[in-house]
């Protein structure tokens, strides 16, 4: 756990979050941002960089896809930001699950 990381603090139960899924290695939470009707975050419980987590994205991708299908039957988008230029705001690796409306060409 990184004490400065809000996601690590959520995983440790030190910060509130609406947890939608959790297992031994990952968690899915409701994003506090609400740009589209469904904005969720899927992440490993272990603090990892985006590039490190994407090297082994199988389980997170599978669960994120399943939850996306369940919550956004009309379609959804999975996306991640890598680094400052891509507007990555948290160092803890995570995947955005976006949907619940027509997303257009460039949302997320």
Predicted regions and their residues:
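HIT superfamily nucleotide-processing domains
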Residues: 1-108
